[in-house]
Amino acid sequence: GTGLTIGENVVGMDPEAVFKGGRIVDTVDLKRRVKLYKDYQHDGYGAIIVQANVEDSRLKVQEYAIGELGVECVELKWGQGAKDIGGEVKIKDLKKAQMLQERGYIVLPNPNDPNVIKAFEMGAFKEFERHSRVGMITEESFAKTVDGLRKAGAKYIFLKTGAYRPADLARAVSFSSKYKLDLLTVDAA
């Protein structure tokens, strides 16, 4: 079968997503994407893979996908893979920029600053930038994350990273082996 990865930030960018206590409890967009895949999945072959970055991890997106949507495969992400940037998106709507900041994203300029709001409304600038954080990994936090995903029911756990410094690449290989991940992707290597 064919695997299909649902990338990062799908839940955080979903204007209809519902959160409680800082966690996702309902999402139209992720449910739609998983359902579309499953509707065309043949005899259970293949897998839908839900990727997560720092913001997704904070919102417990993968745990929701496993527990509520029956997803069995998740992918952790270190950095932006092949891109040496932080996952920027342009936002042309003030309310959406404010919503994203409330969900924990870095939004520039600050969409809740009264001076920024006034400048935006006067046309001084036309868009905000939403940035994703680049996570800093310790072995302890990585082990805890993998253990939590396994306890949540993940059958397969992947890691995606970029072709970074040799020490960081060695860490990815070492952690993937030590914590028995199912796949390591080194993007743009």
Regions found by a protein language model. Give the residues of each.
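Active-site entrance/lid segments in N-terminal catalytic domains of soluble metabolic enzymes
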Residues: 1-189
